Amino acid sequence: MLEVYDDAVGACRPGAALADLDRRIRERIADAGYPGQPSHPVCHGVGARAHEPPYAHQAGGGTIEEGMVLAIEPGIYWEGGGGLRVEDNFLVTADAPEKLSSFPDGVVRCT
């Protein structure tokens, strides 16, 4: 899932189509053995509310623009409960997406 997340973050550039980002994430998850996942948007805007447009969706339109704040959240879920999702918020800049939290990516061991 971290590889899918990293790929999604890298594709989050001004001018990129939101539908292409959605398709890219879902294809990577399907290739890993989880077709049809996730059931929620894989990327959405963040502003006055935690979830707001734009929403990345294969059938949708729109492009990523510099200055947008986007939540990238690929995930997989198991029937009967449980799942795995990696999520963070990013400011879209001309050079590269800027992560807005200081929490480290990767696996964190809690003891």
Predicted regions and their residues:
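Active-site neighborhoods and metal-handling regions in enzymes and metal-associated proteins
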Residues: M1-T111
